[in-house]
């Protein structure tokens, strides 16, 4: 379109001067003018894209802390599965899937305890969104040696801000964190903080990555073992972003029929 300049001597000048900001002036061939709201976003600001500087990285130029390559062994046969070095590797993410009741929480809590028992300097944490204190009391009857494991019960913070609670807790710096489960933690934060599912997942995954990188008070490279729920079809419940940041995937299953004594 052409630019039309309206001077003071124009018969429409006073009418135009009285229009509110961001009104669209429609000019017709016969000279008629009307005013309307900006339905098409004609006043929307355009942003200029700055030239992007791309920096390529050579693996030889990367510098890593030696602590990243020191495993956290459990002293069990499971160490051979977790890494070639034997044990949980710092800054990694292990996803644990399995049918309900197969014993995911029990097995992983035992491994969590064994990491700390093998090296008391390693701080371990259990984040429970599935069970409350009463549920864990029953576990304690069977596994009294779990008595000193630090546990964050999200059910204790239903009237608080679970998002801030998780951030504050993880910021203390933990070597190994067991989360039960990924879906329940996300759902708790989503409901209590009025976030969308995608924003909640992005927040939690970004938080995990930051902890992997040692962005906490102790500057330790946190390893996460995250329990996943399975759908009826046997696939895990979660976003593809979770798949992409996974270091390793483990599955616990029944050996033989469901509820059999043996698992693998």
Q: For each of these PLM feature ranges, what is it?
A:
Residues 52-81:
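N-terminal pre-Walker A segment at the start of P-loop NTPase domains
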């Amino acid at each position: 379109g052409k630019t039309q300049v309206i001077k003071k001597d124009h018969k429409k000048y006073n009418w135009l001067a009285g229009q509110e900001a961001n009104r669209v002036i429609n000019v017709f061939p016969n000279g008629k003018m009307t005013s309307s709201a900006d339905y098409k976003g004609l006043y929307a600001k355009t942003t200029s894209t700055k030239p992007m500087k791309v920096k390529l990285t050579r693996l030889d130029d990367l510098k890593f802390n030696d602590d990243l390559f020191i495993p956290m062994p459990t002293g069990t046969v499971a160490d051979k599965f977790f890494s070639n070095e034997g044990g949980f590797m710092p800054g990694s993410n292990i996803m644990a899937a399995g049918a309900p009741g197969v014993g995911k929480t029990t097995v992983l809590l035992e491994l969590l305890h064994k990491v700390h028992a093998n090296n008391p300097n390693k701080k371990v944490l259990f984040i429970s969104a599935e069970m409350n204190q009463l549920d864990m009391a029953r576990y304690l009857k069977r596994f009294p040696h779990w008595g000193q494991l630090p546990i964050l019960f999200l059910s204790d913070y239903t009237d608080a801000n679970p998002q801030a609670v998780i951030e504050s807790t993880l910021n203390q710096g933990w070597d190994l964190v067991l989360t039960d489960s990924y879906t329940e933690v996300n759902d708790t934060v989503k409901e209590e903080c009025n976030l969308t599912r995608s924003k909640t997942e992005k927040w939690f995954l970004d938080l995990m990555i930051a902890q992997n990188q040692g962005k906490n008070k102790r500057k330790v490279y946190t390893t996460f073992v995250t329990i996943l729920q399975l759908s009826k079809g046997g696939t895990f419940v979660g976003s593809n972003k979770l798949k992409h940041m996974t270091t390793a995937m483990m599955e616990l299953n029944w050996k033989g029929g469901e509820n059999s004594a043996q698992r693998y």
